[in-house]
Amino acid sequence: MVSKKSNDQSVEYASKSLRVSINSYISFLNDPSLKNATEMAIASNLAGMAINISKTTAPHAVSYPFTSLFNVSHGHAVGLFFEKFFSFNYKNKDKSEPSFDLKKRFDLIFNLFDVQGINDFTSKISLIKKQAKLEDNLQTLNINIKQSSDDIIKGINLLRPVSYTH
């Protein structure tokens, strides 16, 4: 939704995806049913349609070495630094020059998550990740950034389309 390549259509797909997944994700993980599995499949399809237009962003490009080097599942790896990337982009939104009103996009995201701003948003994402039992502590995941930094940097997939706001 904040990718420079996003447009009204991708934002519509992403918004619909988030409306569904926000309400179904944790229940799907905790007590899978045909209903919430169907909802998550629909959300996934809508998200894929949005990404097909807007392309992936920095958290996705950075995820690959965490999967290949440390066996962190791809989706989990994408989420490892999501709040940090999102917060950075929010705090630097005035330095970005997208073809759309970036503040309105952030406000839409905050509205979808029923939060009041960036701090509430990052807290809510952290809570969702905790409820999903997605570990963020790199030490707990046996990831030593300093020791592995060269391999991590080499593993970042620059061929994947990356068009975050910065």
Question: What are these regions, as identified by a protein language model?
Answer:
Residues T165-H166:
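Conserved small/polar residues in nucleotide/adenosyl-binding loops
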Residues S17, A58, A77-F81:
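Catalytic-loop motifs flanking and including active-site residues across diverse enzymes
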Residues M1, S24, P65, K84-F85:
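Amphipathic alpha-helical segments in well-ordered regions
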Residues M1-S54:
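Carboxylate- and glycine-rich phosphate/diphosphate-binding segment that chelates Mg2+/Mn2+
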Residues S21-I22, P59-S63, L102-D107, K129-E135, ...:
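Short acidic (Asp/Glu) and glycine-rich catalytic loops that position anionic groups and cofactors
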Residues L18, M40-G48, F82-F85, I125, ...:
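Short alpha-helical scaffolding segments that buttress acidic/His motifs in well-ordered protein cores
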Residues M49-G75:
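Glycine-rich phosphate/pyrophosphate-binding beta-alpha loops
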Residues S68-Q147:
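Gly/Pro-rich interdomain helix-loop hinge
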